[in-house]
């Protein structure tokens, strides 16, 4: 069942995307998480959808949502592209994709695991922090081989 806020959010998101030369592919509002997660999937009809497209849409939609106050409480906005499989490397990418689902691969294994899946919290000089079902996992950067955006729910 579609969340009741999805239709007004969609009505707001479509013109925002069109102004940026993008299309809204889908919108899902996950209220079973705290804070709730608003996921907006976009595509660029002119070329492969890239990180810059997601960043531009995220900034523009966030401003529009804040101005209208459609969502009354705190939430996390995720803007992505269906099928995007992107390795995060730069500080800018880690900041832009805060709150997004990621897969962190380590070698050797960290605490007995070589792959960690969770929501990206942040990265500092020594660690990457992810939220895994409400638990903060701190993974030493020296062990990390890659951090990828994760498509899975």
Swiss-Prot record:
A GO-annotated cellular component: cytosol
Primary location recorded for the protein, binned into one broad class: cytoplasm
Taxonomy, superkingdom: Bacteria
Keyword Cytoplasm: yes
A Pfam family: RimP_N
Biological process terms in GO annotation: ribosomal small subunit assembly; translation
Subcellular localization, as worded in the UniProt entry: Cytoplasm
Cited Gene3D superfamilies: RimP-like superfamily, N-terminal
Key words, A-Z: Cytoplasm, Ribosome biogenesis
Keyword Cytoplasm (UniProt): yes
Family recorded in the similarity comment: Belongs to the RimP family.
Function: Required for maturation of 30S ribosomal subunits.
UniProt protein name: Ribosome maturation factor RimP
